[in-house]
């Protein structure tokens, strides 16, 4: 039986604790998470740190329960600085892009940022694979940079989150193995089509893209 009170809630799903080892995530719109679960099973099968899938039933996904703060939470408490957060974020993304993909391209997460990384005792684990697909790795790099820039500019997140996002953007740009600018326009288009964006986030998309270009030129002058 599903608990009545969510353990956590996102923009389009709720997460319920089933026991100490498992959680159930339910999509509010009723869509099946089967495709997402297949990607998660693929990456964990190749040793990548993502929650292990136990079952898919309708709109419900049962998976491992993770214990620890998100990377953003660790930044907020001062346990991780922006440079280290950038290294962790870029490192996970580089590892993901190095995995074999069924279609021969790269596996993209397309929502990889510090609030989707859980800092467990065994190491960082990447969650929320809803947007995952195959494609060009630089699109994923551009999306992460764009999200961080948006958070720093949108004015919908309480202090000190915008400042941490700005510093985290520089940390990410310093450590990523990809090109954050080459496919940035494509990332802007995908982000603009996201129905879960707040109006304030949509309003700063162009400015966020400009911020990525500016910071990439400053942090990665040799590119």
Language-model regions: role of each:
Residues 2-37, 41:
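ATP-binding glycine-rich loop module of kinase domains
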Residues 13, 58, 146-223:
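Helix-rich C-terminal or lid/interface subdomains of diverse kinases
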Residues 14-18, 98-139:
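Active-site acidic catalytic loop and adjacent metal/ATP-binding pocket
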Residues 41-42, 46-49, 72-115, 124:
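Conserved kinase catalytic-core helix
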Residues 43, 65, 147:
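Conserved catalytic core of Hanks-type protein kinase domains
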Residues 51-56:
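Conserved beta3 strand of the protein kinase N-lobe
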Residues 58-70:
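Conserved short submotifs of the Hanks-type protein kinase catalytic core
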Residues 123-161:
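Active-site Asp-x-Gly
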